[in-house]
Amino acid sequence: MVDKNSLRKLMLLKRAELNDLEKSHLDQKINQKLMAFLITRPTIKNLALYIPIKNEVAFLDNFLDFLKLNKITSCFPSIVDQFNMKFIDQNNNEINPNDIDCFFIPLLAFNKANHRIGFGKGYYDRYLSLTSKKQLKIGIAYDFQYAEFTNDPWDYQLDLIICNG
């Protein structure tokens, strides 16, 4: 089994190898699945998204339009300091962790138990520890980001991973 740091490097490389057309096609498939997921859960009104970096799955315009049409409010992470983050709305107001119905969470790798590997700073693991089990935590990834690894006790287990496949 590969160690987490090697796995991070490998997945960053794999994402970087996607050409624009491949990435656009995969992102479109995933965005369609995200919309289908949200349609089945009409109680989700406050959704935590992320601003994609380093070739993470992007939220496309049709997805963002879907959120507006369905009156789903989106919020985004904002780094507070080297250990903590918060989520803010479009007016830069901090959102209480318990007011978020569902989190769409980026990742570098995931395993069969829905544990994720991120960039290794622990921002999401610490933030999600403030939330309740009722709030959905959904990992967003490409299929090729699946890997077998041993999770650490502090690694947060997600409810579901949504991929292109």
Curated annotation (Swiss-Prot):
It is an enzyme of class 6 (ligase). Mg(2+) binds at D125, D155. Its EC number is 6.3.3.2. It comes from the Bacteria. InterPro entries: FTHF_cligase (IPR002698), FTHF_cligase-like_sf (IPR024185), NagB/RpiA_transferase-like (IPR037171). ATP binds at residues 4-8, 116-124, 126, 154. The keyword Magnesium applies. SUPFAM superfamilies: NagB/RpiA/CoA transferase-like (SSF100950). The keyword Zinc does not apply. GO terms for molecular function: 5-formyltetrahydrofolate cyclo-ligase activity; ATP binding; metal ion binding. Its cofactor is Mg(2+). Keywords: ATP-binding, Cytoplasm, Ligase, Magnesium, Metal-binding, Nucleotide-binding. It is found in: Cytoplasm. It catalyses: (6S)-5-formyl-5,6,7,8-tetrahydrofolate + ATP = (6R)-5,10-methenyltetrahydrofolate + ADP + phosphate. Pfam families: 5-FTHF_cyc-lig (PF01812). Substrate binds at I51, E56. Signal peptide: none annotated. One of its GO terms (biological process) is folic acid-containing compound biosynthetic process. Belongs to the 5-formyltetrahydrofolate cyclo-ligase family. Involved in folate metabolism. Catalyzes the irreversible conversion of 5-formyltetrahydrofolate (5-FTHF) to yield 5,10-methenyltetrahydrofolate. This is 5-formyltetrahydrofolate cyclo-ligase. It comes from Mycoplasma genitalium (strain ATCC 33530 / DSM 19775 / NCTC 10195 / G37).
